[in-house]
Amino acid sequence: QWGQHPNIPP
């Protein structure tokens, strides 16, 4: 559900 965040794992 991420991927769009630079600091959060995909």
From Swiss-Prot:
GO terms for cellular component: extracellular region. Coiled coil: none annotated. The modification Pyrrolidone carboxylic acid is found at residue 1. The keyword Secreted applies. One of its GO terms (molecular function) is toxin activity. It is found in: Secreted. Keywords: Hypotensive agent, Metalloenzyme inhibitor, Metalloprotease inhibitor, Protease inhibitor, Pyrrolidone carboxylic acid, Secreted, Toxin. Transmembrane segments: none annotated. Belongs to the bradykinin-potentiating peptide family. This peptide both inhibits the activity of the angiotensin-converting enzyme (ACE) and enhances the action of bradykinin by inhibiting the peptidases that inactivate it. It acts as an indirect hypotensive agent. This is Bradykinin-potentiating peptide S5,1.
